């Protein structure tokens, strides 16, 4: 074998390449008079990571154990040569091998007898990767399963497998896909029978490549001949040839290296003459698995296999299966199997020979073939050709994949697609490969398939991701919540919670694109159970006439609560009762006439929409809505008739360049940044609607609304009556917006404008109008606030929102909105058009009185529920016969200042306004500013005081400026010191100081470095360190136990010595040295020692102690010897000074 390194992963098997192997041949000899039984060996060979499985050492040449015995015993041999490079990473990783080649020796059996003979061919279980308890064949291996030949009609079987694979990229338990493999099936035949009975039992060979628990594996690239046997009549030898070539396994735990370029040849075998008795041919059981199947065999992609066949009796023909598969890489995922395609296979042939007088039984093999990840469920890789006799389901046509039957609901695979979808077997995501074309009318569904370009999705299925191409509908499901993104050109639908996007999608007229329920032909269809989420339509989306593109579940004309008036729908859809997320359509989608593009629900004139909750809907740059069509974001309607409804709307934005033709409606909800407003009162003509919550509506640059069209945010209609407590959102119209005659551009009670703040009820709304905006006579341009160039005057407790409007804005009558009206300088109100707005100033929390102006006596004013401030700027020209309720001032051809009605302070207008004609009392001047101290006392400029840990100063403008009081930094303490902090009652800052560290013991402080004895244990001494106490225990090395009365303690009362009769005793000694002598008094140890019993922990028993009185201490002394010639000789000796009872085995002191 030749292999590259295994890169990473636990239990990862190194890939192999360039190996070739040849299978040896074997034959059985003739039989004799005695009985013989040939039992071939069971060879279990594993390359990597198999628990409890034997493995062949890399580079080793092994001959499987052979045996030679009496008649009929056959010898078998296996030749394996392997060379390995290092294993790079991972626990349980097997080094890769290379350059291996092996040849199988031949064996033959000696003469047998006329009795029964049994030859057992192998049972080959082949697995590629990661199967628990399942054997695997290394990718690219060519194997011939052991064959058997017995009595009449018994046919031997063989298997040839050749596989080539690309790398397995990532994932735990991921199996590398294989491609380009071809295999040939060896043939076998049985010889004529004789007089004796014979049984052929194939050998059991378990071969696995990687990561199988308890499963043996064959080293990649190794050439192995399974143990062969030759015995009495009819016994045939078996052989296996395996050749593998692999690329590296990249990453992942339990990942199997992919293989490529392998070829193998199958050895042949034949049986000798048999007997006339009964014969049974038991062919091998070949279990082949590719990846991750628990107890389920699978065929490696690209493998060509001929399942072992068996033949018995006259005319019995064995069956075989040839599978050749080519696969793409498996990219990622746990237990994910790469898809395969373009496979072809050839079936090996087998035949049975003539039989004799006995009965014969032929049991063909059971071949279970599985591609990926099915628990106990066999599956065939797409493109595989499989013979009958296997427990597989339907095989698709035209290259389509096959789905298993008998498990959870499996989908049907359809013509024109190379895709297999499974439901309920393994949770995952099913997608259609990019650039794949599915012709119109085709369909590919998970649970339910519909025909005619309309898709139906079961509402009770778990969420998933579906990718749809034009002209057909395709839905799938997955239980994985999260985001899903569709491939460009493929719309997507499903019930999965998350975010989905559409990119440059074209939906053909009459087709449907659903998130949960599909609209067909532009008409609304009810649906339930849709998922909340976000759907966006990106640039270039075109929805033809009659189409419906819906976000959530839609229903037709749902009514809730009492209502009056007829309900009609324009071409498009009216839906209700759904919950959706955020919808956005990006630049240049074109919506043809009669179509509808809804975020949640939409309705046209005289329709009622109830009970919906939407997110944010936006139509961006260049959106074109043809006449009669509607582009709605949330629950919108035009001219809603009477009825009580409660609706919560999201946010809708229409960007610049949007064109709405005559008769169309662009209904959008309001609410800035996805936050809906609340309480807007909108409705149709002469209709009062309460409790509707709206958000923000915005019309972008250059938007053009043609005559008769409407651009509504909260479904606001002309001549409407208000209800108390309305709240508005934020509406902006940028410069250059043109609203043609007869059209309406309604916000939430919205406005054209920018940069200003307005509030209806309590919520603040920002409005403003840019120069050049023109509203033709008869049109509606209703705004929440149109401010004038007014400079706000402040007062105590009042913050007046400053607003501004440029000149040149003309408005028309026939519309009224509650609130304050502010008209800029030079603004002209032309007959037939009314420009109304509402303003509430921040901090006041009131709504200003509205203005109702017009030329007809029938126009009435509107009074708000709260008082506020009303102002008109200078040079305002209004039409005659204006009736005002609240605080307004009107006159023909004169400039009037507003009348102020406010319980608190009132802000005045510009200087010119104060000098013009006035109606009402002038506003009182605010009191002069005064600084107040913490107790309410007045302070003068320059005064400084402290309050609540703040240092306050009265400035020259007589305003109080308070800043947090600055605290001093804590000191830095030295080694052996610690920082002590405390906070005094009269200060806001903590005060810190350093003090020496001490150790507190028994209410006594000890300085660092000091030590003291434990009063309860004199052998323990404590030392005070910077980190705390340190205990020191004194050691008494020579201390032996004795009774308390015989103990003599030292000064610390810790260690002691034992009293005994063993003591030094003086003795006179004559010393002779070099002829010189002297008599000296020395000391010796004299006394008795007590015998004790001690426990020896080494030998686990008691033993007697043998103690002797021996010297314990000594000293050197010098003496002078007298010589015979009268001279002296100095001499030194050791004088014993102490004695004790010591172990005689102890070495004496030196």
From Swiss-Prot:
Low complexity: compositionally biased ranges: 1-36, 46-79, 86-117, 127-160, 167-198, 208-241, 248-279, 289-322, 329-360, 370-396, 473-506, 548-558, 590-625, 790-833
Disulfide bonding pattern of the chain: 1062-1109, 1076-1123, 1085-1139, 1089-1141
Tissue: Submaxillary mucosae.
Residue span(s) of domain VWFC: 929-995
Amino acid composition bias (Gly residues), ranges on this chain: 671-682
Keywords assigned by UniProt, alphabetized: Disulfide bond, Glycoprotein, Repeat, Secreted
Keyword presence, ATP-binding: no
Region 6 X 81 AA tandem repeats: start-end pairs: 1-368
Cellular component terms (Gene Ontology): extracellular region
Glycosylation sites: 46, 50-51, 57-58, 61, 66-67, 73-74, 76-77, 81, 83, 87, 91, 93-94, 96, 98, 101, 103-104, 106-108, 110, 114, 117, 123-124, 418, 547, 917, 985, 1002, 1068
Top-level taxon of origin: Eukaryota
Sequence repeat residue numbers: 1-44, 45-125, 126-206, 207-287, 288-368, 369-391
Keyword Repeat belongs to the record: yes
Pfam families: Cys_knot
UniProt cross-references to InterPro entries, sorted A to Z: Cys_knot_C, Glyco_hormone_CN, VWF_dom
Domain CTCK: 1062-1146
Compartments, as annotated in UniProt: Secreted
Compositionally biased spans, kind Polar residues: 442-459, 507-517, 537-547, 564-586, 626-635, 643-661, 688-697, 706-729, 779-788, 875-908
Region Disordered: start-end pairs: 1-730, 776-925
Post-translational modification: Extensively O-glycosylated on most but not all Ser and Thr residues of the repeat units. Highest glycosylation appears to occur on Ser residues which have Gly at positions at +2 or -2 from the glycosylation site or, where Gly is the penultimate residue. The presence of proline (usually at position +3 or -3) appears to also enhance glycosylation.
Subunit details: Intermolecular disulfide bonds could help maintain a multimeric mucin structure.
PANTHER family (alphabetical): MUCIN-19
Domain statement: Contains tandemly repeated, identical sequences of 81 residues.
Function per UniProt: Apomucin is part of mucin, the major glycoprotein synthesized and secreted by mucous cells of the submaxillary gland. Its highly viscous aqueous solutions serve to lubricate the oral cavity and to protect it from the external environment.
Name of this protein: Apomucin
